[in-house]
């Protein structure tokens, strides 16, 4: 028989009162003993019946791809939300007539195959960048010795492929690649100056966007607004004498400059990065990081708005002003930092803390906007010129990145900070700089997850409160009695609803049958964060 908690609780209280009445007739000592016992039972009943706010990560479906030991292969995974996932196996064979072979497989949310496709690229063009929207995946290839490019377009619904060839004039080094409608937008450098060019799929013409090709400037980001049919360019001037400034320029589909929003240095504070969230037509909320002077080290988060050519006042939020920014530290160190901040305030000064941070795109929940930023620092190794050890070519080169902690902030629709939180990443290391922490919104809580050393780490928060501390989960193999000997290139993405996708490379052996040969596979795992009721939908 299933009864509600209220009914069960009322019956317990009724029995509790009757029991106390009986023991009252036996004396005070018996009454005290009865109350202690029944209070313990009441606590136990409440602990059992009150729903727990905890969950756990479970693996529901797994797909494996045998790795070809003969060819150089890479696995690329593109989550498509509720439309499924696209898996790209990139094969490189420099002795073949077509050295680059891209093989695509589209899966549904149950990881069942929907279609397969492939395209081949001959000698002379190297893979540069990719971009996808809801309809297509685009791959950009370029000839390092000429202006020739080719763009391969893959229809995500049918698997049909198309190659678009042409020449992109005025771009020597490509750093950003986006597509708006039937126009590709490439950002990069030409003769050491920043440039953004548009390439038409129809007439193969090239158009350079105005007001960008100038000295002492760098392109920070390139975005497209499909709904407004606009190209958005973030650039930062690097003039030390007059001060650095962030500028946002928005262009029409035909390349015409529509709006310019410049944010010059304000009290020695300059904006570093920016993420846009549309509010109304031609009106955006802008949130990003800012620094002191022209430094590349952030000392806080800023919030502002732009509407047409109008820029609204900027609100600055110092890291030291955030309630939980230093929660990633150990208690003793955190206490020392808080004492330092208090001393600075008594002296009438501000305590500044500077970090290199990577700001993610917004995650929109029903009630707020969530921003994730990760603190990192590059790792270097020195390359020595053996012929001349004193040569200027002996320079430190970036050899990967280490992440120290993640900052999570919640903003309302007007850009007001509602809460902040942070947690350590414990020196997570990657070869390339990119977002690591993935978040999934579930039942008014946020599941934070990131991969490390072939495992998945999770933490559950509700605003500034930690609901469940960090947990570590193994990425399981297909069969029992198997052991993972080696794991590499572990990646994770928030997929849809409460689901995550994990993928990477594993070398596996059987612990039951030693005669079975080891296998090397690319894997794709669907992970589910179980809800409070203990059930996980597939």
Question: Model features per residue range: what roles?
Answer:
Residues 359-379, 384-385, 389-390, 403-404, ...:
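Loop/turn-rich, solvent-exposed surfaces of beta-rich toroidal or solenoidal domains
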Residues 64-102:
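Beta-strand-rich domains and repeat architectures in extracellular enzymes and scaffolds
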Residues 112-148, 161-174, 260-270, 423-427:
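Blade-loop segments of beta-propeller domains
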Residues 101-109, 151-157, 198-201, 245-256, ...:
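Beta-propeller blade signature
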Residues 83-96, 134-144, 180-190, 197, ...:
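Short beta-strand elements that form the blades of beta-propeller/WD-repeat-like
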Residues 1-60, 538:
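Bacterial Sec-dependent N-terminal signal peptides
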Residues 262-273, 318-335, 345, 350-353, ...:
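Conserved blade-ending motifs and adjacent loop-strand segments that build the rim/top face
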Residues 69-77, 122-131, 168-179, 215-224, ...:
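Repeated scaffold domains used in trafficking and secretory/extracellular systems
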């Amino acid at each position: 028989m299933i009864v509600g908690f209220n009914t069960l609780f009322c019956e317990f209280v009724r029995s509790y009162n009757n029991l106390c009445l009986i023991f009252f007739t036996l004396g005070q000592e018996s009454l005290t003993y009865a109350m202690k016992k029944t209070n313990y039972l009441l606590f136990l009943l409440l602990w059992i019946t009150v729903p727990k706010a905890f969950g756990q990560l479970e693996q529901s479906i797994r797909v494996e791809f045998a790795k070809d030991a003969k060819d150089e292969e890479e696995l690329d995974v593109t989550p498509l939300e509720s439309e499924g996932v696209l898996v790209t196996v990139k094969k490189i064979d420099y002795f073949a007539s077509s050295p680059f072979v891209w093989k695509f497989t589209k899966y549904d949310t149950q990881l069942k195959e929907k279609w397969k496709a492939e395209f081949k690229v001959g000698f002379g063009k190297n893979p540069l960048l990719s971009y996808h929207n809801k309809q297509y995946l685009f791959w950009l290839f370029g000839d390092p010795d000429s202006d020739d490019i080719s763009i391969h377009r893959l229809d995500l619904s049918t698997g049909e492929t198309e190659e678009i060839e042409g020449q992109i004039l005025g771009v020597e080094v490509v750093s950003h690649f986006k597509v708006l409608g039937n126009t590709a937008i490439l950002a990069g450098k030409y003769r050491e100056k920043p440039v953004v060019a548009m390439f038409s799929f129809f007439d193969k013409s090239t158009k350079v966007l105005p007001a960008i090709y100038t000295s002492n400037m760098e392109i920070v980001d390139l975005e497209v607004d499909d709904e407004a049919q606009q190209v958005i360019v973030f650039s930062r001037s690097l003039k030390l004498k007059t001060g650095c400034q962030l500028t946002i320029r928005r262009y029409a589909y035909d390349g015409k400059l529509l709006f310019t929003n410049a944010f010059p240095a304000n009290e020695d504070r300059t904006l570093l990065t920016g993420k846009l969230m549309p509010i109304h037509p031609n009106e955006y909320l802008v949130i990003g990081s800012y620094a002191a002077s022209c430094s590349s080290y952030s000392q806080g988060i800023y919030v502002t708005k732009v509407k047409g050519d109008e820029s609204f006042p900027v609100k600055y939020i110092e890291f030291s002003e955030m309630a939980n920014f230093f929660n990633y530290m150990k208690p003793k160190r955190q206490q020392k930092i808080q004492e330092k901040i208090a001393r600075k305030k008594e002296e009438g000064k501000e305590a500044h803390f500077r970090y290199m941070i990577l700001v993610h795109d917004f995650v929109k929940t029903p009630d707020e906007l969530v921003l994730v930023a990760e603190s990192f620092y590059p790792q270097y190794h020195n390359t020595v010129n053996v012929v001349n050890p004193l040569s200027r070519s002996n320079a430190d080169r970036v050899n990967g990145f280490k992440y120290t902690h993640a900052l999570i902030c919640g903003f309302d629709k007007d850009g007001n900070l509602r809460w902040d939180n942070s947690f350590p990443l414990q020196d997570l290391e990657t070869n390339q700089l990119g977002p690591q922490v993935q978040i999934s919104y579930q039942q008014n809580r946020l599941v934070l997850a990131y991969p490390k050393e072939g495992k998945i780490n999770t933490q559950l928060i509700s605003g500034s409160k930690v609901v469940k501390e960090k947990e570590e989960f193994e990425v399981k193999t297909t069969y029992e009695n198997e052991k993972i000997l080696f794991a590499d290139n572990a990646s994770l993405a928030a997929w849809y609803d409460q689901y995550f996708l994990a993928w990477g490379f594993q070398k596996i052996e059987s612990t039951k049958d030693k005669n079975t040969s080891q296998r090397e596979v690319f894997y794709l795992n669907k992970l589910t964060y179980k809800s409070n009721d203990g059930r996980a939908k597939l």
